């Protein structure tokens, strides 16, 4: 290496001699050009014709031959190139070492942005407010209260429905003509009538609290196979015919007396219908009826509450309906 360093000369230390292309030669060339062409001075800024094919006159005493470099010159250039390459490599190695030392600790230390998102391993986790699973798992009292309220509402709604199912029956019983309208709703009202027989027994003395057996009365007008519907028809006809025919009869007091023995007669025939229902139905119906054979016809729609009563009452129904309606 020492021999190479001694042999190699840098461009800054060297005195370059390019022969005829030296600056001294160029100056002489300019002087010669000026001397040769004093008659045509060059005017800058003005366009003048130039012949690219014209060959400049060769000045005398100048060597313009540029031949290949001698082997000695090539060796010098090679040595200089090698030395430059070695120095550049050393500089590059030093820079890498410096960068490696500086970047080493940086690589070990992760970026703070990643720490903020990974809460399991970060030391900042203790400083964060604890909101997590406890608050979510234990429901707040405010969330429990609306549930209780909703259940209370459901219970109150059911109670209202039960009471409302009983109230319309008393309203309907006030006038015999009202029975014709609910007859169309007989399938919907019949379950209410079936579910509320004990309430009728309790409210029997009132006379108008009985649930909706009068509603099923109408379907008899059209021939229908089900027993419940066939029992109901005789009533609206009789109810509509009786008040129209016997309204002028003023005997309001003896009518309940006539109905009471009829009630005692009809109780054994029902075989399962509570006597209080028949009594309440008779008292609640405001139609005047003096004949005995028509009273059991009006009582029969109250009996379909029990299945046994329906089956037993079907044949007498067919016999009694034509006589009562006509």
From Swiss-Prot:
Residue spans of biased composition, Low complexity class: 132-148, 182-198
Subcellular location: Cytoplasm; Cytoplasm, Cytoskeleton, Spindle; Cytoplasm, Cytoskeleton, Spindle pole
Keywords of this entry: Cell cycle, Cell division, Coiled coil, Cytoplasm, Cytoskeleton, Mitosis, Phosphoprotein, Repeat
GO-annotated molecular function: microtubule binding
Modification sites for Phosphoserine: 22, 47, 65, 70, 122, 140, 186, 190
GO biological processes: cell division; mitotic metaphase chromosome alignment; regulation of mitotic spindle organization
Sequence repeats (start-end): 38-41, 68-71, 213-216, 223-226, 233-236, 301-304
Ranges annotated as biased composition (Basic and acidic residues): 112-124
Ranges where the record places region 6 X 4 AA repeats of P-X-X-P: 38-304
InterPro entries: DDA3/GTSE-1 (IPR026657), GTSE1_N (IPR032768)
Coiled coil: 70-94
Function summary: Required for normal progression through mitosis. Required for normal congress of chromosomes at the metaphase plate, and for normal rate of chromosomal segregation during anaphase. Plays a role in the regulation of mitotic spindle dynamics. Increases the rate of turnover of microtubules on metaphase spindles, and contributes to the generation of normal tension across sister kinetochores. Recruits KIF2A and ANKRD53 to the mitotic spindle and spindle poles. May participate in p53/TP53-regulated growth suppression.
UniProt similarity note: Belongs to the PSRC1 family.
Protein name in the entry: Proline/serine-rich coiled-coil protein 1
Natural source organism: Bos taurus
Gene: PSRC1
